[in-house]
Structures are given as C-alpha cells and as structure tokens.
C-alpha cells in the first residue's frame, strides 16, 4: 500500500516514493494525468503550506468519504477488526465548523498552524475551518504577546511562556 497525500481516488498519477516502511510506503504526487471530478482548487490561501486542512482540495462529499474511509482502513488494516463505519454526518456549513482550535505560537511569535509533518509554524490570519471567534482570539493573543513582549514557548529549548489553545465554541455544530 502506498499513501500519497493529496491524491484523489480514481486519479491516474505519477508518484515518487519518499519513504519505505515495513508494510507500506509513502509517496508524493509528481504529475496528475487525469484529475478526479472530486478534486477542486482550495479556496484557502494557505493550502499546501499549512498542515491544518488536509482535505481542502476535495469536494465536501468526497472529504466526508475520505475521512470515513481513513477510519475504516485503520480499523481493518491496523486493528484487524471487521467493522463497518457508518456514513459521516456532515456539517451544515463546511466552513468554520471545527470545534477545537489549537494555534501553536512559533519561536518568533507568529501564530498559525504547523506545516504538515513538521513543528514549523505557518503564520495564519484567518482559517476557513476554524470558527471566526477562534481566529479573532488567536490574533488578539498575538497582539497581546507583541505588546507585552511575552515570549513564545520554544520546544527545542523548553523555554518561553505561551502556546495558544482556544477551547471549543458552545454553538450548535449541526
């Protein structure tokens, strides 16, 4: 089995193997020959840089299918269980639906999300899947840190004061 981030089912692609593991491989897309009708251009200006939204290149129904399939595969392949995962009930609005917001603060004081598979912070002002209130809170904390010269936590040194976490919103998620 080869895991290829950002590939969409049904596509014909050229890929490069980037990592070989015991029972699988990881790869990256080199060229897409036949894009899936379920592939779309992400509206997010941070897509491809930020690791916070791995499915924004998919239509929303395909995103729900991919998430369900990921759980089904993990239960079957890793867990050895023969269970059927039910269909995912999607959000009423596929934007600003995330009910847990966690914004890391970079050593330079930038606030955003980690770049995929790294702990490098990609500065972000507005996220399409976080609540607008969470975005405003993150920006306010960033301004507060700059104003009062509050140091960000640096995981390499273990020093610093701030790693931002915004709790869930109480509003109905549908």
Locate predicted features:
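Single conserved hydrophobic/aromatic residue that forms the stacking wall/gate
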Residues: 168-174
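Accessory RNA-recognition modules of RNA-modification enzymes
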Residues: 1-167
């Amino acid at each position: 089995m080869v895991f290829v981030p950002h590939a969409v089912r049904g596509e014909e692609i050229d890929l490069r193997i980037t990592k070989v593991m015991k029972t699988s491989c990881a790869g990256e897309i080199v060229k897409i020959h036949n894009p899936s009708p379920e592939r779309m251009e992400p509206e997010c200006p941070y897509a491809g840089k930020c690791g916070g939204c791995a499915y924004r290149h998919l239509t929303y129904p395909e995103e729900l299918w991919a998430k369900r399939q990921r759980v089904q595969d993990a239960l079957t392949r890793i867990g050895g269980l023969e269970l059927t995962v039910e269909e995912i009930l999607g959000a009423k609005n596929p934007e600003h639906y995330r009910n847990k917001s966690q914004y890391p603060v970079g050593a330079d004081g930038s606030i955003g999300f980690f770049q995929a598979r790294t702990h490098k912070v990609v500065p972000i002002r507005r996220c399409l899947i976080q609540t607008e209130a969470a975005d405003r809170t993150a920006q306010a904390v960033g301004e507060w840190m700059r104003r009062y010269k509050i140091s960000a936590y640096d995981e390499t040194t273990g020093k610093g004061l701030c790693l931002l976490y915004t709790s869930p919103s109480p509003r109905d998620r549908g």
